[in-house]
């Protein structure tokens, strides 16, 4: 889900200055009006289930170290803080926020805010990867994702088709 289809609150600046973004660029908060800006990505899914929620951002030394990201899912809300000065671990583009259950609902969303941040907050893209239960590793307690397998087909492809239909 690209920033171009997300709902913005406050003034965000479009940029392509730092590489590592998805699609045509990313947004930043111009390091101003802290606490008054947010960007909400509505989760577009064809059916409910478990999803690995991932956020992308071009990292850099002048980025926020405590960017709040709230995942609004079927079981409530979960706030996660990400350090945008560090490179994302997935393909050097995405960082996982965790696995959450979503239903096909208007409420399902991911929101990045500037509340309590210093330096630049970056908003690029969000993707949801469907997760299926497997019988392997179900007894392992070392990983919160034990017994789960991330399916290679990304829900982002479906969302991109939906965006194209809306244009």
Outline where the language-model segments fall.
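Short, surface-exposed beta-strand/strand-loop-strand elements in extracellular ectodomains
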Residues: 59-79
């Amino acid at each position: 889900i690209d920033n171009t289809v997300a709902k913005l609150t406050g003034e965000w600046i479009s940029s392509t200055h730092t590489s590592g973004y998805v699609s045509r660029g990313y947004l930043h908060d111009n390091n101003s009006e802290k606490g008054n800006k947010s960007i909400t990505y509505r989760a577009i899914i064809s059916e409910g289930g478990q999803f690995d929620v991932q956020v992308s951002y071009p990292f850099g030394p002048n980025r926020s170290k405590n960017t709040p990201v709230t995942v609004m899912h079927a079981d409530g809300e979960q706030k996660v803080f990400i350090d945008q000065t560090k490179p994302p671990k997935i393909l050097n583009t995405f960082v996982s926020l965790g696995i959450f259950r979503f239903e096909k609902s208007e409420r399902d969303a991911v929101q990045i805010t500037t509340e309590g941040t210093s330096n630049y907050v970056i908003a690029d893209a969000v993707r949801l990867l469907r997760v299926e239960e497997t019988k392997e590793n179900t007894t392992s307690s070392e990983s919160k994702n034990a017994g789960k397998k991330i399916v290679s087909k990304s829900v982002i492809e479906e969302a991109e088709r939906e965006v194209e239909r809306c244009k």
